């Protein structure tokens, strides 16, 4: 639908959703998510996915608050992007575990920049700039600072 009104840059990042559960949880499949209380960061992909499984969705402004509530038994699972999920698994070592979303049937999503329809010069410039950021390592540093960090 969006492709009808805008063009997109080349994808610059691929996101995968993960499920964070308590370390002793037996939740392992999509069916296990049904009727659970799922914590999500408001407005994220995890938020939209959770609504497919339950009406018990707890929305948070910050992902860390959702994980804290998981640790404290207020939610059953948290659905979140891979990188922050792995950071939380380390931060809350022994209390939570992060499970790949593919195990639950979650698909990957690509991030791209929306551009004015038909502006190939701008698309070429944006794609070139992203390629440069990736080539010199800046992109990886940005991911580490702004996506992996919480």
Language-model regions, residue ranges each:
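Acidic, polar ligand-binding/catalytic clefts
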Residues: 1-32, 97, 103-105
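A ligand-binding cleft/hinge motif common to bilobed small-molecule-binding domains
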Residues: 1-5, 76-107
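Short, charged, surface-exposed secondary-structure boundary motifs
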Residues: 3-5, 49-50, 67-74, 109
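Bilobed "Venus flytrap"/periplasmic-binding protein-like clamshell domains
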Residues: 14-67, 82-87, 120
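A bilobed periplasmic-binding-protein/Venus flytrap-type ligand-binding module shared by bacterial periplasmic
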Residues: 18-27, 108-129
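Hydrophobic residues within well-ordered alpha-helices
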Residues: 33, 70-71, 113, 126
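Conserved functional loop/turn residues at catalytic and ligand-binding sites
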Residues: 37, 73-74, 137
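Ligand-binding clefts/hinges and TM-proximal coupling segments of bilobed small-molecule sensing domains
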Residues: 45-61, 65, 96-103, 124-150
């Amino acid at each position: 639908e969006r492709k009808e009104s805008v063009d997109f840059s080349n994808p610059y990042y691929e996101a995968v959703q993960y499920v964070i559960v308590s370390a002793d949880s037996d939740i392992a499949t999509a069916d296990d998510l049904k009727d659970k209380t799922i914590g999500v960061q408001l407005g994220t992909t995890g938020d939209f996915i959770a609504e497919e499984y339950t009406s018990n969705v707890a929305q948070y402004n910050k992902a860390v608050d959702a994980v804290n509530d998981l640790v404290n038994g207020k939610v059953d699972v948290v659905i979140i992007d891979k990188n922050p999920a792995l950071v939380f698994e380390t931060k809350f070592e022994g209390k939570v575990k992060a499970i790949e979303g593919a195990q639950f049937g979650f698909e990957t999503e690509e991030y791209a920049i929306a551009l004015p329809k038909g502006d190939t010069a701008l698309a070429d410039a944006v794609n070139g700039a992203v390629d440069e950021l990736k080539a010199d390592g800046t992109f990886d540093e940005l991911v580490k600072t702004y996506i992996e960090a919480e």
